C-alpha cells in the first residue's frame, strides 16, 4: 500500500511529469511511503497466491489534493510471516468448505431432478394441478441449486480486465432467471386452475395423487438431511495475530439457502398430501385447484422478497443491515478525522459488500495511520469485504458541500 498526499500544483496531464509530485510532500510522509513500498515488495510469492493486494494513488479533486487506497483482501494482517500462515490456512479451509458444499448441492440436485420427473408424471397421470404446481416449485429450487453450484465455482475464478469484481453477480443473474421461470410456470397452472373451478368438470385420481404426495414428503426429508449433515458441523477460520472467528454451523451460505428451499418444499408437499387425503375420502375434487391457488400465493410472496433483494443489488443500494449514519459516526470518531463525505456502501453480490469513503484530515502527518484505522474499523466492525479509503486535507467548503453530503440527507 502506498500513501501520497499530492498538492494541486503537482498534478499534470502527462504521465512523464508525475515525479514532481513528491516535492510538495512533508518529509515524514515521503519516508513513510518509501518504507511501505519496500515492505510490499517483500511479500513472498507463496503469500500472493492467497492474497489480493491493496494499492494507492493520488489525483486531483475539486481543487484540493488527496490520496486513497483500495483494500480487496480478506485479512488485515500481512501475508508474510505468522500472519500469512494463518491467512493461507483460512483460505484453504474456505476452499475445502466450498468443495464440500458443491458435492452436497450436486447430490441434492440429482435427487431433485429424479423426483421432479416422477412428480410431473404422477401429476399428469392423476390429473392433479396441485402436484404439478409442487413439481414446478421444485423445478425452481433445482435451478437454484444449480445456480448455487455455479456461484461457488465462479467464486474461485479470478477477476479479469473486463470483470474487475470477478463473477460475484453471476448468482444474482441466475436467481433472477430462476424466479422468472417459476413465475411463468405458476401463471400457466393458475390459468388452468381457474378453468377447472369455472367448469367444475374434472377427475382426479386420488390414489396416484396420494402416493405421489407421500413420496414427495419422503424425498424432501431425505434432501433436508443430506443438506444438514453433508457439509459437516463445527467450522472455524483463523485471522492473523490474535483474531479467531467461528462459524458454528459450518455450513456454506449456498447450502443454508438450499436447506430453506427444501423446507419450503416439504411444507408444500405436506399440503398436497392433505389435499389428496381430502379428495380420497370425501371426493371433493375442488381441493386440487384450490390447493394450487394457495401454493401460487406462497410462491408469489417468497419470490417477491427475492426479486426485491435482486433489485437492490443491481441498483447498488446500501444493504438493509447497514446504517450509513452509524458508519459515518464511527469514522468521524477516529483521531484526526475532521470530516467524512462521499460515503458509499453497496452489494457486489448477495453476500459481499464494497465500501468507499473520503476522510478529511486535520493534519497530513497521520494520513497513513488514519487509513489503517479506517480500514480496520470498516472490515472488523462492519464486515466489509472490499474497502476504499481516500484521505484529503480538511476543507470547510467541501465539508459543507450539499452535493458531497446529499446521500446523508436523502
From Swiss-Prot:
Biased composition regions of type Basic residues, renumbered to the chain: 50-69
Tree of life domain: Eukaryota
Organism taxonomic ancestry: Eukaryota, Metazoa, Ecdysozoa, Nematoda, Chromadorea
Keyword Ribosomal protein carried by entry: no
Organism: Caenorhabditis elegans
Protein name as it appears in the record: Zinc transporter ttm-1
Segments for region (Disordered): 1-94
GO cellular component, one term: plasma membrane
Induction: By B.thuringiensis pore-forming toxin Cry5B. Isoform a: Not induced by zinc. Isoform b: Induced by zinc specifically in intestinal cells.
Amino acid at each position: 500500500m502506498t500513501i501520497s498526499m499530492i498538492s494541486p500544483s503537482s498534478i499534470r496531464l502527462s504521465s512523464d511529469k508525475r515525479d514532481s509530485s513528491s516535492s510538495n510532500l512533508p518529509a515524514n510522509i515521503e519516508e513513510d511511503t518509501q518504507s511501505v513500498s519496500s515492505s510490499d515488495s517483500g511479500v513472498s510469492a507463496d503469500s500472493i497466491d492467497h492474497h489480493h493486494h491493496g494499492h494507492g494513488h493520488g489525483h486531483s479533486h475539486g481543487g484540493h489534493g488527496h490520496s486513497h487506497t483500495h483494500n480487496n483482501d480478506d485479512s488485515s494482517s500481512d501475508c508474510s510471516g505468522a500472519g500469512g500462515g494463518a491467512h493461507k490456512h483460512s483460505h484453504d479451509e474456505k476452499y475445502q468448505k466450498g468443495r464440500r458444499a458443491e458435492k452436497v448441492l450436486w447430490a441434492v440436485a440429482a435427487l431433485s431432478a429424479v423426483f421432479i420427473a416422477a412428480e410431473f408424471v404422477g401429476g399428469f397421470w392423476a390429473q392433479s394441478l396441485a402436484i404439478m404446481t409442487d413439481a414446478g416449485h421444485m423445478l425452481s429450487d433445482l435451478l437454484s441449486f444449480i445456480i448455487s453450484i455455479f456461484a461457488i465455482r465462479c467464486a474461485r475464478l479470478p477477476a479479469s480486465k473486463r470483470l474487475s469484481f470477478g463473477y460475484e453477480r453471476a448468482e444474482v443473474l441466475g436467481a433472477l432467471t430462476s424466479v422468472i421461470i417459476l413465475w411463468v410456470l405458476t401463471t400457466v397452472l393458475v390459468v388452468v386452475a381457474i378453468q377447472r373451478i369455472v367448469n367444475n368438470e374434472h377427475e382426479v385420481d386420488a390414489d396416484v395423487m396420494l402416493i405421489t404426495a407421500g413420496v414427495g414428503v419422503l424425498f424432501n426429508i431425505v434432501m433436508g438431511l443430506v443438506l444438514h449433515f453433508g457439509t459437516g458441523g463445527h467450522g472455524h477460520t483463523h485471522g492473523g495475530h490474535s483474531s479467531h472467528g467461528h462459524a458454528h454451523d459450518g455450513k456454506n451460505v449456498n447450502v443454508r439457502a438450499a436447506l430453506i428451499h427444501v423446507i419450503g418444499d416439504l411444507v408444500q408437499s405436506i399440503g398436497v398430501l392433505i389435499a389428496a387425503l381430502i379428495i380420497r375420502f370425501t371426493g371433493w375434487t375442488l381441493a386440487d385447484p384450490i390447493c394450487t391457488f394457495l401454493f401460487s400465493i406462497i410462491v408469489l410472496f417468497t419470490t417477491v422478497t427475492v426479486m426485491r433483494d435482486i433489485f437492490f443489488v443491481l441498483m447498488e443500494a446500501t444493504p438493509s443491515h447497514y446504517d450509513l449514519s452509524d458508519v459515518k459516526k464511527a469514522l468521524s470518531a477516529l483521531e484526526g478525522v475532521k470530516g467524512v463525505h462521499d460515503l458509499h456502501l453497496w452489494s457486489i453480490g448477495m453476500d459481499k459488500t464494497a465500501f468507499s469513503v473520503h476522510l478529511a484530515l486535520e493534519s497530513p502527518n497521520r494520513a497513513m495511520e488514519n487509513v489503517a484505522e479506517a480500514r480496520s474499523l470498516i472490515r472488523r466492525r462492519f464486515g466489509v469485504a472490499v474497502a476504499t479509503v481516500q484521505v484529503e486535507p480538511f476543507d470547510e467548503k467541501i465539508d459543507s458541500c450539499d452535493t458531497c453530503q446529499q446521500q446523508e440527507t436523502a
